[in-house]
Design a protein with these regions (language model features):
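N-terminal secretory signal peptides that target proteins for export/translocation
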Residues: 1-9
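Sec-dependent N-terminal signal peptides
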Residues: 10-26
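Beta-alpha junction/loop-to-helix N-cap segments that form part of ligand/metal-binding clefts
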Residues: 12, 87-94, 105-176, 242-249
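N-terminal extracellular/periplasmic Venus flytrap/periplasmic-binding protein-like
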Residues: 38-133
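Extracytoplasmic ligand/sensor domains, especially the bilobed periplasmic-binding protein
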Residues: 137-240, 288-314
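Extracellular/periplasmic periplasmic-binding protein-like sensory domains
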Residues: 183, 279-356, 436, 440-443, ...
């Protein structure tokens, strides 16, 4: 979804606590990454801010793959069974199942019930799982695979349409038969958060450290982020390329320290715990640490609490903070449905990614009607959507389009600060212009042809 999307080798096994939203000064204290929803989940098929997307109907026989008289088979890609980080993206099938149960209770898509096919690539089986989906599934919705590049030609060849949870590699970002609800492309990136930190830490960003796992699917978006940071005033003095799986972060932390890095976007795009511990052990104190949105969870909060010598730790996000769910009816509905249909499952931003994809898909599929439910129809309706924010779950996007027709990302972002007692919305750092978001065309960085060529060569 985010055009700088990373491998998300991080999952917290901690149960998510009830959250309280406390307004004080310029920040909103979030005691957890989830909230108790106070609204009663509707069984009418109406989603707040999106409208009626599920309802009874005639269904009917169809010659379209994956579409039956009373059912629609949908693939949900993930990497949950991998042995490097077990449980990776397990939220995607969990959220998909919860959404399907909610939608089916309201009558389904014009009378057809959604059937979820869990397509678990376990990191290294993207091609095999896509091949399996090509046999029986109508479309792929609300999922993603960290190493997605091998899946692209297979999916395109069989015409498996996709409304993705997220994409990583350039090949996947630009793929056909796909709508990305986040508007990702390869020649631009929403990066206003780098600029926000440039204003707050003008000296520190002149010695920045970044990095990415040594595989094209991750190097490409992170190199894109490097170019964007430099366009926003950062000077990158060290860019590390560790292997995808790192057991000991001490040597990498020491290299950042030796290079005098004072503004840090870590090469660790997985679990922050060992990286934070390595920083504490080394006595490394840059001016701040900036993390991607995938770190917005209780484990990161615990890491900060367990390592009190860490500098300020920030998270950039384009998703409504789950702990503020009560402030946004669409997010509150998501949390309510997860509590009802996926009891005990932790909720994090992956659930939001999945949800906004499912909401777009259901809205488009319902618009097609029972007799015209085809991949082309669904994608055309999704691609024609304007002012999309999934009812407020994600930062707003003016218009969507097919992924191979130059979509544009949202110009909006928000900043969170990780503190020992909670993750707080940092209003002062965000400088919001619209709701909680900082929305400005200048937040979107356009890459040069030379930069794009360098990324494509990785």
């Amino acid at each position: 979804m985010f055009c700088k999307r990373l491998i998300q080798l991080r999952k917290s096994a901690l149960p998510l606590a009830m959250a309280a939203v406390i307004f004080a000064g310029t920040s909103i204290a979030l005691s957890s990454t989830t909230a108790a929803a106070t609204a009663v989940s509707s069984s009418s098929g109406v989603w707040p801010g999106v409208g009626k997307i599920c309802e009874p109907g005639p269904g009917g026989a169809s010659s379209v793959r994956g579409v039956g008289d009373k059912t629609i088979n949908i693939a949900v890609f993930n990497d949950a069974s991998n042995t490097i980080t077990p449980g990776l993206e397990v939220e995607f099938p969990e959220q998909a199942t919860a959404f399907a149960d909610w939608c089916n209770a309201a009558g389904g898509i014009d009378g057809r019930k959604i059937v979820i096919d869990n397509r678990d690539a376990a990191l290294f089986n993207a091609a095999q799982q896509t091949t399996a989906a090509c046999q029986i599934d109508f479309m792929a919705v609300g999922g993603g695979m960290a190493l997605d590049q091998p899946a692209v030609p297979i999916r395109e060849k069989c015409g498996l349409g996709q409304i993705t949870g997220y994409v990583v590699s350039n090949a996947s970002v630009l793929a056909s038969d796909q709508v990305d609800p986040g508007g990702g492309n390869t020649d631009s990136i929403t990066a206003g958060y780098f600029g926000a930190l440039t204003k707050a830490y003008p000296k520190a960003v002149k010695a920045a450290g970044m990095g990415a796992g040594d595989t094209p699917s991750v190097l490409q978006p992170e190199t894109k982020a490097e170019f964007a940071a430099e366009a926003q005033g950062w000077k990158v003095v060290d860019f590390l390329e560790p292997p995808v799986s790192v057991e000991n972060w001490a040597p990498y932390v020491e290299q950042y320290q030796q290079k005098g890095v004072t503004a840090l976007w870590p090469a660790d795009d997985s679990n922050f715990t060992p990286f934070a511990q390595a920083m504490t052990t080394a006595g490394y104190h840059p001016a701040f640490v900036l993390l991607g949105t995938q770190f917005d969870n209780t484990q990161t909060q615990k890491d900060v609490a367990d390592n009190p010598s860490l500098p300020p730790v920030y998270i950039e996000t384009g998703w409504w903070p789950l702990a503020q769910a009560s402030q946004n009816p669409s997010t509150e509905e998501l949390v309510t449905i997860m509590h009802k249909y996926a009891k005990g499952d932790p909720i994090d931003f992956d659930d939001e990614e999945g949800a906004e994809s499912w909401l777009l898909w259901a809205k488009a599929a319902s618009a097609c009607g029972a007799s015209n439910l085809t991949v082309t129809c669904v994608l055309n309706h999704a691609a024609a959507t304007t002012n999309w924010d999934a009812g407020g779950i994600q930062a707003p996007i003016a218009s969507l389009t097919l992924s191979n027709e130059n979509p544009q990302p949202s110009p909006c972002f928000a900043m969170l600060k990780v503190e020992a007692k909670g993750i707080v919305y940092d209003k002062a750092l965000t400088h919001p212009t619209q709701s909680i978001w900082n929305c400005n065309p200048k937040n979107v960085i356009q890459l040069t042809a030379a930069q794009q060529a360098e990324i494509n060569a990785l």
